[in-house]
C-alpha cells in the first residue's frame, strides 16, 4: 500500500511540475511568443471594415486595409450580372486582382486575422492575392467574414491551401453589429 501511495505522490508531483512549467499563450501579450497581431481586411461596402475595426480594438492589433489597385464600383459588385467584374473574378479560382496596399514588415506578426465579405460562398479572389503575397509560414491565420446570410464556407480550407506552412483556423462569419466583447472572446479562443 505504501508503494502505491508513493508512486501516486510521484505522479502528482510530476504532473504539477508539468503544469507549472509548460509554455503558455497569452492573448494579453498581443500574440504568441511576444509577437504582434494584425487585422487585415478587404471591405467593398464598409461592413467588413466596421467589424475589422472592432476586432482590432478588441485585440490591440494593428489594422491594415487590403485595397485593390482598381477600386470596385457598384456595377463591379453586381452579383446578379454575370459580366460584372466580381462575377468574372469569382468564376475562376485563378483570378488574382492586384492589391495597391502593402504590409512593410509581415515578420513582426505572429497572428493575422484576415477579414472579407463572402462572395459566391467563399473569400473574394483579392484575398487569395493577399495570401500569396506574403510569407505566412508558422503564423496563425484566422479568417473572419461578413455576410447577411451566407456562412464562411470553405474559405479557411481555401486559404490553408494557399499557405500550407501557416496554421489557418476555420474562421467565423459575423454580423456588422457584433460587439467588441463578443469579438474579444472569439479572438482569444483563436490564438
Task: List the model feature ranges, each with a label.
Residues 3-7, 16-191:
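Active-site-proximal alpha-helix that buttresses catalytic centers in soluble enzyme cores
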Amino acid at each position: 500500500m505504501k508503494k502505491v501511495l508513493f508512486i501516486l505522490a510521484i505522479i502528482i508531483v510530476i504532473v504539477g511540475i508539468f503544469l507549472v512549467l509548460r509554455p503558455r499563450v497569452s492573448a494579453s501579450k498581443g500574440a504568441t511568443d511576444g509577437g504582434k497581431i494584425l487585422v487585415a481586411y478587404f471591405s467593398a461596402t464598409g461592413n467588413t471594415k466596421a467589424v475589422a475595426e472592432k476586432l482590432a480594438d478588441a485585440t490591440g492589433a494593428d489594422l491594415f486595409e487590403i485595397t485593390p489597385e482598381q477600386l470596385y464600383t457598384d456595377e463591379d459588385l453586381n452579383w446578379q450580372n454575370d459580366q460584372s467584374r466580381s462575377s468574372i473574378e469569382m468564376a475562376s479560382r485563378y483570378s488574382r486582382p492586384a492589391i495597391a496596399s502593402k504590409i512593410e514588415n509581415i515578420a513582426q506578426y505572429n497572428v493575422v486575422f484576415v477579414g472579407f465579405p463572402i462572395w459566391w460562398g467563399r473569400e473574394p479572389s483579392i484575398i487569395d492575392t493577399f495570401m500569396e503575397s506574403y510569407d505566412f509560414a508558422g503564423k496563425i491565420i484566422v479568417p473572419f467574414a461578413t455576410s447577411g446570410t451566407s456562412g464562411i464556407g470553405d474559405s479557411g480550407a481555401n486559404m490553408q491551401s494557399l499557405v500550407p506552412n501557416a496554421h489557418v483556423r476555420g474562421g467565423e462569419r459575423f454580423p456588422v453589429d457584433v460587439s467588441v466583447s463578443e469579438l474579444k472572446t472569439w479572438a482569444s479562443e483563436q490564438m
